[in-house]
UniProtKB/Swiss-Prot annotation:
The species this protein was found in: Corynebacterium aurimucosum (strain ATCC 700975 / DSM 44827 / CIP 107346 / CN-1) (Corynebacterium nigricans)
Keywords (A to Z) from UniProt: Cytoplasm, DNA-binding, Transcription, Transcription regulation
Taxon lineage: Bacteria, Bacillati, Actinomycetota, Actinomycetes, Mycobacteriales
HAMAP family, alphabetized: Transcrip_reg_TACO1 (MF_00693)
Name this polypeptide is given: Probable transcriptional regulatory protein cauri_1421
PANTHER family from the UniProt entry: TRANSCRIPTIONAL REGULATORY PROTEIN YEBC-RELATED (PTHR12532:SF6), TRANSLATIONAL ACTIVATOR OF CYTOCHROME C OXIDASE 1 (PTHR12532)
Parts forming coiled coils: none
Cited NCBIfam families: PRK00110.1, PRK12378.1, YebC/PmpR family DNA-binding transcriptional regulator
Main location class: cytoplasm
Length: 251
């Protein structure tokens, strides 16, 4: 997969269609609430909250919903849930390792939803630690290329903890330790470079190459998992060639 973004394949994003729009809104709102609770309700002093609000606005979440979530998280308004992050591990069809990240206020419900989706779509839930050792957590910062060069990005972020700068076509992807994401973001802002997105990803040390039909099975399983309101992200170790990606793009 040289030259192609793992962002698009190891972390499958929901299609932005009307049927899934409401669920995506709910997940973005949940992230705002958690960010405000963890780091305070002032976006200027809480880079994570600022990023979450920008993501929600980019997805056209109404401003009223964003503001209420921020206030619930910071304690300015009552009604915030007791969210916790839970990771589930397992295998999909063809031995593809999967990490399922949930943000939930009910562990039993989340576990049931994940187990049901896995069982019905050719996967199986594993014990804690069964696949996590194959993945390492990585911080990601995305920048629109525009007129920028790779050197422009490197000069701005090298002292802030950046590890690599990858050219993904329309964007540069900067990788770093998860804890260095705020510093990399701030270094870019200081250099008058606009940050498009920040995130954390789980990258696999060993990947499983798949043909298009097998990849479709994994994506069906991911869609079933993401039908649960508790599931935030799904990470896999599948490896898709440019040819397979092109074939999937025709679906």
């Amino acid at each position: 997969m040289a030259g192609h973004s793992k962002w698009a394949t190891t972390k499958h994003k929901k299609a932005a269609n009307d049927a899934k729009r409401g669920k995506e809104f709910a997940k973005l709102i949940k992230n705002i609430e958690v960010a405000a609770r963890t780091g305070g309700g002032d976006p200027a002093a809480n880079p994570t909250l600022d990023d979450m609000i920008k993501k929600a606005k980019k997805a056209s979440v109404p401003n009223d919903n964003i503001e209420r979530a921020r206030k619930r998280g910071s304690g300015e308004e009552a009604g915030g849930a007791d969210w916790e992050t839970v990771m589930y591990e397992g295998y999909g069809p063809n031995g593809v390792a999967m990490l399922i990240e949930c943000l939930t206020d009910n562990r039993n419900r989340a576990a049931t939803d994940v187990r049901t989706a896995m069982t019905k779509n050719g996967g199986n839930l594993g014990e804690s630690g069964s696949v996590a050792y194959m993945f390492s957590r990585t911080g990601l910062v995305m920048v629109e290329k525009g007129e920028l060069s790779e050197d422009d990005i490197l000069i701005a972020v090298l002292e802030a903890g950046a590890e690599e700068v990858n050219d993904n076509g329309e964007k540069f992807e900067i990788t770093c330790a998860p804890g260095d994401v705020p510093a990399v973001r701030e270094a870019l802002v200081a250099a008058d470079i606009e940050v498009d997105d920040t995130d954390t990803d789980f990258r696999a040390s060993v990947e499983v190459p798949l043909q298009a039909d097998d990849a479709r099975k994994i994506f069906r399983l991911i869609d079933a998992l993401e039908d649960s309101d508790d599931v935030q992200n799904v990470y896999t170790n599948m490896d898709l060639s440019e040819e397979v990606l092109a074939e999937l793009g025709e679906d």
